[in-house]
UniProtKB/Swiss-Prot annotation:
One of its GO terms (cellular component) is cytoplasm. Pathway: Cell wall biogenesis; peptidoglycan biosynthesis. The lineage of its organism: Bacteria, Bacillati, Bacillota, Bacilli, Lactobacillales. It comes from the Bacteria. ATP binds at residues 119-125. The keyword Transport does not apply. Cell wall formation. Catalyzes the addition of glutamate to the nucleotide precursor UDP-N-acetylmuramoyl-L-alanine (UMA). InterPro entries: Mur-like_cat_sf, Mur_ligase_C, Mur_ligase_C_dom_sf, Mur_ligase_cen, MurD. GO terms for biological process: cell division; cell wall organization; peptidoglycan biosynthetic process; regulation of cell shape. It catalyses: UDP-N-acetyl-alpha-D-muramoyl-L-alanine + D-glutamate + ATP = UDP-N-acetyl-alpha-D-muramoyl-L-alanyl-D-glutamate + ADP + phosphate + H(+). This is UDP-N-acetylmuramoylalanine--D-glutamate ligase. The keyword Cell wall biogenesis/degradation applies. One of its GO terms (molecular function) is ATP binding.
């Protein structure tokens, strides 16, 4: 990692632990900062805080006392999940204390070039595809960021022979200043996380931070299926490389069942190892990045053909007596579920949907769920999802939790059917995250098979 001294002897407050906060605290300590960690979880239930304290890092747990900010901190590094209307963050900003996320730290110390991937849907799959293609080409793509590996941790061991392939959420991108990828990808932009950002325009602005420091020597890969992406083209200094499944573009595109890059066939769409129209878009974005990094077509084709998907994103779980189970717990919004359903015959699908109520109706989902065999509905948003099912003429049953929903869906299915968990909602009404929800689905399927 690069040796930097800008944090040496500076007082830094790390707000919120989890993986990224813990990694940031250790990195800042290594860089010579005077670190204080503040986390809301009680100390006795907080192994990360206990470990940091043993290493000599100051830890304050069990709440977020505003008087902590009476100290003169030079910087705050916040967990990306903590909203900016948190009183601690509001007070820090009012005092002129910069508030960053650990993604910024990763950029500052990284010897490796960075490819950043953001968007509303497809981030994890596209990030994984890019990482696998680059690694197959000998460029060693290191996955990091929102994909589960703290960027500031991975960056510490990356060399200039590696490439950091970083999945970036809007939450993370709100906390960057100097962050500068050589290639950035925005998979798509849809209204989501409005409860965090306040409006769609603010959400887009957060995503757009990915390109703030890019120049004409850098590449911004945009989805030209969306007019919004086309409109944004004039607002960046970066060189835009488009991808599209709807039209021929000066980049990566779909035509007559083939995936092209600038007029050259790379592979057939039906050779991609995972189903669904959304995965064609993900593959096109990957092809654009790979070609910009001089990866040959054969390597791209072989890697994407062998690609098995990622956990919780249209993940095939098992087959029980001819009923196939798919875990798409990562589909936390309407568009993601629409794309998941596009890969199946609705008449053979029992869909499990519902979760955190963000106040939105599901009318957009009605055409996509029409013709489903059945639905199993759960969660805070159940009443809203039921209204959409009624409009689509789909029969449904209600469930109390994911285990109950999985069992009921199996009872409704017959040989040749698919049980699809694709909630179109976040998990936080019942579960800590979509991974927990998906793992419970997987565990219940295993129990059903016994």
């Amino acid at each position: 990692m690069k040796v930097i001294d800008q944090f040496k002897n500076k007082k830094v407050l790390v707000l919120g632990l989890a993986k990224s906060g813990e990694s940031a605290a250790r990195l800042l300590d290594k860089l010579g900062a005077i670190v204080t960690v503040n986390d809301g979880k009680p100390f006795e239930d907080n192994p990360a805080a206990q470990s940091l304290l043993e290493e000599g890092i100051k830890v304050i747990t069990g709440g977020h006392p505003l008087e902590l900010l009476d100290e003169e901190f030079a910087l705050m590094v916040k967990n990306p999940g903590i909203p900016y209307n948190n009183p601690m963050i509001e007070k820090a900003l009012a005092k002129g204390i910069p508030v960053l996320t650990e993604v910024e730290l990763a950029y500052l110390i990284s010897e490796a070039p960075i490819i950043g991937i953001t968007g509303s849907n497809g981030k994890t799959t596209t990030t994984t595809m890019i990482g696998e293609v680059l690694t197959a080409a000998g460029q060693h793509g290191l996955l990091s960021g929102n994909i589960g590996y703290p960027a500031s941790q991975v960056a510490q061991t990356a060399s200039d022979k590696d490439t950091l392939v970083m999945e970036l959420s809007s939450f993370q991108l709100m906390g960057v200043q100097e962050f500068h990828p050589e290639i950035a990808v925005i998979t798509n932009l849809m209204p989501t996380h409005i409860d965090y950002h306040g409006s769609f325009s603010e959400y887009v602005a957060a995503k757009w931070n990915i390109q703030n420091k890019m120049t004409a020597a850098d590449f911004l890969v945009l989805n030209f299926n969306q007019d919004l992406a086309k409109d944004l083209t004039s607002k960046t200094e970066a060189t835009v490389v488009p991808f599209s499944t709807l039209e021929k573009v000066d980049g990566a595109y779909l035509e007559d069942g083939q995936l092209y890059f600038r007029g050259e066939v790379v592979m057939a769409a039906n050779e991609i190892g995972v189903p669904g129209s959304h995965n064609v878009e993900n593959a096109l974005a990957t092809i654009a990045v790979a070609k910009l990094r001089d990866v040959d077509n054969q390597t791209i084709k072989e890697t994407l053909s062998a690609f098995g998907g990622v956990k919780h994103r249209l993940q095939f779980v098992d087959d029980i007596k001819g009923v196939k189970f798919y875990n798409d717990s990562k589909s936390t919004n309407i568009l993601a579920t629409q794309k998941a359903l596009s890969g199946f015959d609705n008449s053979k699908v029992v869909l499990i949907a519902g979760g955190l109520d963000r106040g939105n109706e599901f009318d957009e989902l009605v055409p996509d769920i029409t013709g489903l065999k059945k639905m199993v509905i759960l969660g805070q948003s159940a009443e809203r999802v039921k209204r959409a099912a009624d409009k689509a003429g789909v029969a449904y049953v209600e469930a109390t939790d994911i285990a109950d929903a999985t069992r009921k869906a199996y009872e409704l299915a017959t040989q040749g059917d698919v049980v699809l968990l694709s909630p179109a909602n976040a998990s936080w009404d019942m579960y800590a995250n979509f991974e927990v929800r998906g793992d419970l689905f997987i565990d219940t399927v295993a129990e059903l098979k016994e």
